[in-house]
């Protein structure tokens, strides 16, 4: 899967603080084709991408109460594609008028020895999974419809089983901090997917 699009804003010094705006939902297996058909009609005039990714979640425990989390992901169906290292910050849930969950996001392409490097840095792998699905685009919005597979034998991505009888649906935008108006566009797009799927601003802490 590709990295999020890079902003075209000029950088005069330092780095741009990028944020991920996110809405999430799910759809049962038997409703998948109807949702795919709807997305084909609503999204940009191009064939949706398919992806098959292996993701590993690494933790680094320190003095702080909660561990530092990094995600390493690689494509299993695109030979030569780089590994991606991703950091997702704590969600900003305070603004009730904001229609999407917002969190700091850093996503970079790396060399293939990423996991060895993380282990040398003191991280340990917490869990891993395979994600398989479809990727649609609508302007700067990215819509992912995918199923998560549990890896039965650690490190063996050929030995998996589906985690549930549904597909996750994620609508996201990666943009510089302060561009909260994108959440309005996301809400309007999400409304067009009802009643097939209800995309919501979900606090991950509610799922713990």
Curated annotation (Swiss-Prot):
Keywords: Activator, Nucleus, Phosphoprotein, Transcription, Transcription regulation
Annotated positions of the Phosphoserine modification: 66
Cellular localization per UniProt: Nucleus
Protein name: Mediator of RNA polymerase II transcription subunit 18
Subunit and interaction comment: Component of the Mediator complex, which is composed of MED1, MED4, MED6, MED7, MED8, MED9, MED10, MED11, MED12, MED13, MED13L, MED14, MED15, MED16, MED17, MED18, MED19, MED20, MED21, MED22, MED23, MED24, MED25, MED26, MED27, MED29, MED30, MED31, CCNC, CDK8 and CDC2L6/CDK11. The MED12, MED13, CCNC and CDK8 subunits form a distinct module termed the CDK8 module. Mediator containing the CDK8 module is less active than Mediator lacking this module in supporting transcriptional activation.
Predominant location category: nucleus
Any one Gene Ontology molecular-function term assigned to this protein's record: transcription coregulator activity
Family classification: Belongs to the Mediator complex subunit 18 family.
PANTHER family reported in the protein's UniProt record: MEDIATOR OF RNA POLYMERASE II TRANSCRIPTION SUBUNIT 18 (PTHR13321:SF2), MEDIATOR OF RNA POLYMERASE II TRANSCRIPTION, SUBUNIT 18 (PTHR13321)
GO biological process terms on file: positive regulation of transcription elongation by RNA polymerase II; positive regulation of transcription initiation by RNA polymerase II; RNA polymerase II preinitiation complex assembly
InterPro entries referenced in this protein's UniProt entry, alphabetically: Mediator_Med18
Function text: Component of the Mediator complex, a coactivator involved in the regulated transcription of nearly all RNA polymerase II-dependent genes. Mediator functions as a bridge to convey information from gene-specific regulatory proteins to the basal RNA polymerase II transcription machinery. Mediator is recruited to promoters by direct interactions with regulatory proteins and serves as a scaffold for the assembly of a functional preinitiation complex with RNA polymerase II and the general transcription factors.
Transmembrane segments: none
Keyword Nucleotidyltransferase: no
GO CC annotations, alphabetized: core mediator complex; mediator complex; nucleoplasm; nucleus
Organism of derivation: Homo sapiens (Human)
């Amino acid at each position: 899967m590709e990295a999020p699009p890079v902003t075209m804003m000029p950088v005069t010094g330092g780095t741009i603080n990028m944020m991920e705006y996110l809405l999430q939902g799910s759809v049962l297996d038997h409703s998948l084709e109807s949702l795919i058909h709807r997305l084909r009609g609503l999204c940009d005039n191009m064939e949706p991408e398919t992806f098959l990714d292996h993701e590993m979640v690494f933790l680094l425990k320190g003095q702080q109460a909660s561990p530092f989390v990094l995600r390493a992901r690689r494509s299993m169906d695109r030979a030569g594609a780089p590994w991606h290292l991703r950091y997702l910050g704590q969600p900003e849930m305070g603004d009730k008028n904001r229609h999407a969950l917002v969190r700091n996001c850093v996503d970079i392409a790396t060399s293939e020895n990423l996991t060895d490097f993380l282990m040398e840095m003191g991280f340990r792998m917490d869990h891993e999974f395979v994600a398989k699905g479809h990727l649609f685009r609508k302007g700067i919005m990215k819509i992912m419809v995918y199923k998560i597979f549990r890896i039965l034998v650690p490190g063996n991505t050929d030995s998996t089983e589906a985690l549930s009888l549904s597909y996750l649906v994620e609508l996201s935008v990666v943009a510089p901090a302060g561009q909260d108006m994108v959440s309005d566009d996301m809400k309007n797009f999400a409304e067009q997917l009802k009643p097939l799927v209800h995309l919501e601003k979900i606090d991950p802490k509610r799922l713990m």
